[in-house]
């Protein structure tokens, strides 16, 4: 015997009704089947609305008409599709039910209220009609059918609207019916009868509970819950799109997940099947070939110690505390007895080890009743100061991680808390059951979605996300986007979902949180209408709960650099080749580091010095290992490396400068390079990394051009005048050559002083052979002397700089992946 249950969406129309019948028929070929049906989708909601509107004296006609139309369409669709379907008889059954419903509602209107017994009789009519219609379908197919009347066969105790079935007595009643083995068995869900023979209903998710009870009474081989999803997922797929379908889970895991908010099954449904060790299979009516999720005594997913993450929103926390709590026997019992008498469900409890306080969560809607009840119960204690005034926190959510394997595997809690910390989510309270099967945290309501997503990513090792917003799409920015596009196959292989969610130039921006199509981004940006707005990017992160957003600033803008602290505080990592932020005031420099540390975000700028060379990272690694910078010398400008290299080869200063400009090494105005300020900025960054608290004005800069030279006018005028310096530079080059040296434009750090100047270096110096646009950096430290640590390579160019930015992007994942 198998018990099947189909929910409201599964019987919403004629097509789905017949699909359910086909599933039942297929199962019946393998053995006897008993089926529990819900009301067609929306019917119960209409019935509840009719009760509420009738009591309030409002018009119920729209709800009544919609409900009648749903059944009319259902019957006509079945009549057209199924030969032999008794349309006229069943239409009469439906019409009679609605006629009775109208009479009952008229009585409610006269009374001005709806007694619970009447309410129960009204809201279960949809299930009753579903069974009548399904019986008609199988009689048309030629099957013998037995309909179990749940009011007669299921004995329930409790309230009219929330009863619990006595399985032992109900088993005897159903057995007495002696159902033939070849019959299709049908029973309306949600409904039972009390010891007076009155109709009662089984509360929320009552049809699932009905199916579990029937399976227990029949000692079924399996209870199948057919719904509109493929099974139980590790998380709500609407919150986490890459949630994984579970093959199996234990009764205890299912109970914990459902208690803490999973929507597939209600905790009451699990109790009967767990008591009688009946496997429960969750299946999709629209996708019957999917394997579904099997709930049983043990889980077969041994490789998944955590089975799911859930959240309960709209909670409030009440803290009862005070000096009188410590050592006072029975205080906790009084607190929860008050909640019980008030009919308020306590969802989560924590108590301090000092016994000074006890905290618990209740639904937000129950908060005021809970507070009043506690204040009445503890009036004297509050008045005398034995208890402190009740402390209440509102708009909270509970995030729970559930899995049998948590008992034996170390580190689950650490990873859970680490994920929340990385997302800047503050934990209000923590609770763990003695079974170690679940751990729950209380957070703010606004943080719940982000908390669930980041926890799922950490615990289930799904694709790691980087959501990139590129500002500035000139040389480096454009090259970066092209590299990201080309590297997508490699990224997918590494399970990295790197999506470009925003592209902006100085005028407009293009955004798509699901990822911009990178094969046509230039055309899309050209047609973009949305003005560039940094505030809009911040709002996107909060609105869509992005997990790992990264601002990539590929501009040279001071205005954008001034926003980095705000970006970090709002949850972005910041990756940039823009040197403006790191060479602003020392105060802003320190604010950036504090903002990054305080928000658990990364500020990465390895391309500030040396473009794609790993300069900053290597220097930081040295210093973190306890090394100390003693001295530094380096060629930090690709353009000046090229120019001074050409001087060695006999070119004049003016010719070398023109050639460097033609090859794209210099800025459009070469005076920007020849001033030495770009080198000074890079040197300041290195000095600050080494721990020196310096400003840009502290750098001693000797420009390439002597002070006596008139460098005024436009670019063409300047370049026309530049040959005036050729003889002087040729003489300096010759003098250096006589000593076996060459001229290099060098940045120096020595004893806390920073200098930028032309230096003559000999063949033993690591800078001697550096030319053609290369950078070279020589770090003399306590560990590296007398021979320095030398980094050498091309330190300019869009592609190498973009590659360095790409590497920094991947470092935003370093807390989760070894990349």
From Swiss-Prot:
State its Enzyme Commission number(s). 2.7.2.4, 1.1.1.3
Q: What is the effect of changing residue 479 to T?
A: In strain: Sr41 / HNr59; Thr-resistant HDI
- Chain spans, region Aspartokinase: 1-249
Where, by residue number, does L-homoserine bind? 667, 678
Q: Which Gene3D superfamilies match?
A: Acetylglutamate kinase-like (3.40.1160.10), Dihydrodipicolinate Reductase, domain 2 (3.30.360.10), NAD(P)-binding Rossmann-like Domain (3.40.50.720), VC0802-like (3.30.2130.10)
Q: Which residues form the ACT domain?
A: 320-394, 401-478
The ranges of region (Interface) come to: 250-470
UniProt KW keywords: Allosteric enzyme, Amino-acid biosynthesis, ATP-binding, Kinase, Lysine biosynthesis, Metal-binding, Methionine biosynthesis, Multifunctional enzyme, NAD, NADP, Nucleotide-binding, Oxidoreductase, Repeat, Sodium, Threonine biosynthesis, Transferase
Q: What is the regulatory mechanism acting on its activity?
A: The enzyme activities are regulated allosterically by L-threonine.
Instruction: Identify the residues that bind NADP(+).
Output: 476, 507, 555, 579, 664, 667, 797
- Specify the domain of life of the species encoding this protein: Bacteria
* One Pfam match: AA_kinase
Query: Which of this chain's residues are annotated to bind Na(+)?
Result: 606, 609, 611, 613
According to its UniProt entry, one GO biological process term is: lysine biosynthetic process via diaminopimelate
Where are the active-site residues found?
Answer: 682
- InterPro entries, alphabetically? AceGlu_kinase-like_sf, ACT-like_dom_sf, ACT_Aspartokinase, ACT_dom, AK-HD, AK-HSDH_N, Asp/Glu/Uridylate_kinase, Asp/hSer_DH_NAD-bd
Question: So, what pathway does this thing act in?
Answer: Amino-acid biosynthesis; L-lysine biosynthesis via DAP pathway; (S)-tetrahydrodipicolinate from L-aspartate: step 1/4; Amino-acid biosynthesis; L-methionine biosynthesis via de novo pathway; L-homoserine from L-aspartate: step 1/3; Amino-acid biosynthesis; L-methionine biosynthesis via de novo pathway; L-homoserine from L-aspartate: step 3/3; Amino-acid biosynthesis; L-threonine biosynthesis; L-threonine from L-aspartate: step 1/5
Which parts of the sequence are annotated with region: Homoserine dehydrogenase?
471-819
What role does it play?
Answer: Bifunctional aspartate kinase and homoserine dehydrogenase that catalyzes the first and the third steps toward the synthesis of lysine, methionine and threonine from aspartate.
What is the name attached to this protein's record?
Answer: Bifunctional aspartokinase/homoserine dehydrogenase 1
């Amino acid at each position: 015997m198998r018990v099947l249950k189909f929910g409201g969406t599964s019987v919403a129309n004629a097509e789905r009704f017949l699909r359910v019948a086909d599933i039942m028929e297929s199962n019946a070929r393998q053995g006897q089947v008993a089926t529990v049906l819900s009301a067609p989708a929306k019917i119960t909601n209409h019935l509840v609305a009719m009760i509420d509107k009738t009591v309030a004296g409002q018009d119920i006609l729209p709800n009544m008409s919609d409900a009648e139309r749903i059944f009319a369409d259902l019957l006509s669709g079945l009549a057209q599709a199924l030969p032999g379907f008794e349309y006229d008889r069943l239409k009469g059954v439906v019409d009679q039910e609605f006629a009775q419903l109208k009479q009952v509602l008229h009585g409610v209107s006269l009374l001005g209220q709806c007694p619970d017994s009447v309410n129960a009789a009204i809201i279960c009519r949809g299930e009753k009609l579903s069974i009548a219609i399904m019986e008609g379908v199988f009689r048309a197919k030629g099957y013998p059918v037995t309909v179990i009347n749940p009011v007669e066969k299921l004995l329930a105790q409790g309230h009219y609207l929330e009863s619990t079935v006595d399985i032992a007595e109900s088993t005897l009643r159903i057995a007495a019916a002696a159902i033939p083995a070849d019959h299709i068995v049908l029973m309306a869900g949600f409904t039972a009868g009390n010891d007076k023979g009155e109709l009662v209903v089984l509360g929320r998710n009552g049809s699932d509970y009905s199916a579990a009870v029937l399976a227990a009474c029949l000692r079924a081989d399996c209870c199948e819950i057919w719904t509109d999803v493929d099974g139980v997922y590790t998380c709500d797929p609407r919150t986490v799109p890459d949630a994984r379908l579970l093959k199996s889970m234990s009764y205890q895991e299912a109970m914990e997940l459902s208690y803490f908010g999973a929507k597939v099954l209600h905790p009451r449904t699990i109790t009967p099947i767990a008591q009688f060790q009946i496997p429960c299979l969750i299946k999709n009516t629209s996708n019957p070939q999917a394997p579904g999720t099997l709930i049983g005594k043990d889980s077969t997913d041994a490789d998944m110690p955590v089975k799911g993450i859930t959240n309960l929103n709209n909670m409030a926390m009440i803290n009862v505390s005070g000096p009188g709590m410590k050592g006072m026997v029975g205080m906790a019992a009084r607190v929860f007895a008050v909640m019980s008498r008030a009919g308020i469900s306590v969802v989560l409890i924590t108590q301090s080890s000092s016994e000074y306080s006890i905290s618990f969560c209740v639904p937000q809607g129950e908060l005021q009743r809970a507070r009043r009840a506690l204040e009445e119960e503890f009036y004297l204690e509050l008045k005398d100061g034995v208890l402190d005034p009740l402390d209440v926190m509102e708009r909270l959510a509970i995030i729970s991680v559930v899995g049998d394997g948590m008992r034996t595997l170390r580190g689950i809690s650490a990873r859970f808390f680490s994920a929340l910390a990385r997302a800047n989510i503050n934990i209000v309270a923590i609770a763990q059951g003695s079974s170690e099967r679940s751990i729950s945290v209380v957070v703010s309501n606004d943080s719940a979605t982000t908390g669930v997503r980041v926890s799922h990513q950490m615990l289930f090792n799904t694709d790691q996300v980087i959501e990139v917003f590129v500002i500035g799409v000139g040389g480096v920015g454009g090259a970066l986007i092209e590299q990201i596009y080309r590297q997508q196959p490699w990224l997918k292989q590494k399970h990295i979902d790197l999506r470009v969610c925003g592209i902006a130039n100085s005028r407009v921006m293009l955004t798509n949180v699901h990822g911009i199509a990178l094969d046509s981004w230039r055309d899309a940006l050209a047609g973009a209408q949305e003005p560039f707005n940094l505030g809009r990017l911040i709002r996107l992160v909060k609105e869509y709960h992005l997990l790992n957003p990264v601002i990539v600033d590929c501009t040279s803008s001071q205005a954008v650099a001034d926003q980095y602290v705000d970006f970090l505080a709002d949850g972005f990592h910041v990756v940039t080749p823009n040197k403006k932020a790191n060479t602003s005031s020392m105060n802003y420099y320190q604010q950036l580091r504090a903002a990054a540390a305080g928000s658990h975000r990364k500020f990465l700028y390895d391309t500030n010095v040396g473009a794609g060379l790993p300069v900053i990272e290597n220097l930081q690694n040295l210093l973190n290992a306890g090394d100390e910078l003693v001295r530094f010398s380096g060629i930090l400008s690709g353009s000046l490396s090229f120019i001074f290299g050409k001087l060695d080869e006999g070119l004049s200063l003016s010719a070398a400068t023109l050639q460097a400009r033609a090859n794209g090494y210099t800025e459009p105005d070469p005076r920007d390079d020849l001033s030495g300020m770009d080198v000074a900025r890079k040197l300041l960054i290195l000095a600050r990394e080494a721990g020196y608290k310096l400003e840009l004005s502290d750098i001693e800069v000797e420009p390439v051009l002597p002070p006596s030279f008139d460098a005024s006018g436009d670019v063409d005028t300047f370049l026309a005048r530049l040959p005036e310096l050729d003889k002087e530079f040729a003489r300096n080059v010759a003098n250096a050559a006589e000593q076996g040296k060459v001229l290099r434009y060098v940045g120096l750090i020595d004893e806390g002083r920073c200098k930028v100047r032309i230096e003559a270096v000999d063949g033993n110096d690591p800078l001697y052979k550096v030319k053609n646009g290369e950078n070279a950096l020589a770090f003399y430290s306590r560990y590296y002397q007398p021979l320095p640590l030398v980094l050498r390579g091309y330190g300019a160019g869009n592609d190498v700089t973009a590659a360095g930015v790409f590497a920094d992007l991947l470092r935003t994942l370093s807390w989760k992946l070894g990349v």
